Amino acid sequence: MNRFFISTLLLLAQHLAPAAASCGLANEASLSANEVQDIYHDFVATSINYADLLKRNEDLNASLSTGSPVEITSTSCTTDTSASTPIITESTSSTSSASTTGSSSSPLPSTSTSCTTSTSIPPTGGSSSLSTPITPTVPPTSTSSTSIPIPPTSTSSTDTNSNPLPTTSTSCTTSTSIPPTGGSSSLSTPITPTVPPTSTSSTSIPIPPTSTSSTDTNSSPLPTTSTSCTTSTSIPTGGSSSLSTPITPTVPPTSTSSTSIPIPPTSTSSTDTNSSPLPTTSTSCTTSTSIPPTGNSTTPVTPTVPPTSTSSTSTPPPPASTSSTGTSSSPLPSTSTSCTTSTSIPPTGNSTTPVTPTVPPTSTSSTSTPPPPASTSSTGTSSSPLLSTSTSCTTSTSIPPTGNSTTPVTPTVPPTSSSTPLTTTNCTTSTSVPYTSTPVTSTPLATTNCTTSTSVPYTSTPVTSTPLTTTNCTTSTSIPYTSTPVTSTPLTTTNCTTSTSVPYTSTPVTSSNYTISSSTPVTSTPVTTTNCTTSTSVLYTSTPVTSTPLATTNCTTSTSVPYTSTPVTSSNYTISSSTPVTSTPVTTTNCTTSTSVLYTSTPITSPNSTSSSSTQVSWNSTTPITGTSTSKVTSSTSIPLTSTNRTSTTFTSSTSISTSSSSTATSSTSFASESSSFYSNVTTSSSTVSTPPPTTSFPSTFTTSFITSSSLSSIPNNSTEVKTASTSSGTEIKTASTSSGSSSSSSYTPASSTSTTTSSVSSRQSSSSSSFTPSSAISTAKSSFVLSTLSILIALYMVA
């Protein structure tokens, strides 16, 4: 066969000589028998797997007559296994390593940003299962999701909470957040809201359920308070209260806001007490349900309200004429309102079943106002509680229990009452000042075509809330329980919402789209928004925390900080790391850029691309190689495989090809693994871009510029040398590099096909990267002739 091959080469050289002569190459282009034999031996010496090349280029002979231009893409990759905790940076293709001084025993929250509809169900600990996917119907345009679970570092803190605090969710459309704690979590029925294709935002911030030492603790969850856009009436009960006919005013379908203000149920002393609750007034457009149980109870407290009721102006008088200095160990009233449907039910302890109340899909509002159950003696009496009445979309009553009790406190009061109506004009601004031991000043909130309410929770020091000003929208500010005074500054938006979450973590992480704080105050960088709503949520902390708005354009940014130790799936790509990660912002048009930072010990899968490893993380970026006209370039897939050996390796390859026509394609997959004694097979795949045949005839092929290059590598087992032979433009090039085990990348592109193959083999303890980039298109007839001859020789050998 060798004789036949050499004879064929000589015959081809003789037949091609006249064509070369027509190009002025009569004396230069022919190949002697020795030259042909040298070329053959060089290819054989490099251990070329011709069968594999033939399989990937079955159309080589047919495409040789087209003379189509080919763009060559070379991929360079560096693998580093020197440490097990890398830091991710964005580059064309890079991985790096870094060590961290912190340890982690439980996960911290994750942040999710979304442009259309975002559904976040972050279970904690153990395993998580979801039998039916949550599939909201959204348009096929701009969506993004950012999931940022932080390493589960065990750190000590002066402000802790043994149970999760309530979650605050703000939405323009629909958002569902059900973060259970401990054990395993399951959700048998999907929550599938249908939303319009416009901006939505959601903020879900559960707090770590870990027990740590603290100077300010709370053994049961606090009530949540949220505010929004129309008006509702709150009826505090001693006994039971019911409302047979809902008051349903007509409100515009725009602007919503939500403010969540948990109140501590701690025992405090006061000089002003009342054994029955004061009424609260809230406003709402639709439904918000918040039932925070206490202690390790797995059953939510669900007060039973009779199906019949009286109007919204009825109010119970105090059950007794008593007053005195005393303490109250039950939670204070909470007022919640919202603008579409938002359900947030954070159970506590090791509960494995989420609390899922059934709520109608249309506007309702709930106001819960439990009285303090403490018996107090008094220096004065009150004949009946104060009452404020306003308009409402629908009214419901919830009563948070106290301590570890699963039964709500329900004092019995006489059925007499009095009421004083409130007058509203197309909008209502309400201020609710709960029970406190020191004076609390609440400033009204000014809105336009909407209602904003401010709720000041129970605190040991005065808390002042400044007004919020909005235009055709509502902006909310939430001030949580804190040991020092916290002042919330106004948020101003224009017909849109942007949310910022400042969670609780041990190491700060900063990016253009989100900010995660440490145990010390963290300030997030403001981002200007258009056509959205802005919401700021400040979590439980020992020192004041200031958060400034984030900004997007024609989109809504949502930040979700869940708590998870299991893999998270991202729609675009996922990156894992055990140390803080900084991502470089990506600018898009009519789209949203998503960044995922995930801590996990198992591989992660996602539709587009995924990178996950217990010791290495790779960040992929593609640079398109363009021809005369580029249509579009997409990106890569990276699958790190880890063996049982101590050292695991990762490899990331990225190829992108654009032809001179308007077609594009990108695809590259690379697998790398190792065992204790030998290398596994290297599996490569190629991407092919089909181009329309040119209008030129076959003889003109010799004057058409195109490239044929091959880069071939062989790595013997435990070898210390990698031999790479490359042939480009008819010139033989040999390069060799040595290392103690190495990684190499090879690419092969035949004369008239458009495929790029990348492969990588990583050895133990070290890695290196080699890349081969062939020269650009040949412009002279001589080089083109030599390339054509060489391509035909290779093809004939493979066929033979």
Curated annotation (Swiss-Prot):
Biased composition (Polar residues): 63-72, 721-734
Protein name listed in UniProt: Uncharacterized protein PB18E9.04c
Keyword Transmembrane helix included in the entry's annotation: no
Source organism, top-level taxon: Eukaryota
Start-end of Low complexity biased regions: 73-314, 321-368, 375-444, 451-470, 710-720, 735-776
CC per GO annotation: cell surface; extracellular region
Region annotation Disordered: where it falls in the sequence: 63-470, 602-670, 710-776
Keyword terms: Secreted, Signal
Position of the signal peptide: 1-21
Localization (cell): Secreted; Cell surface
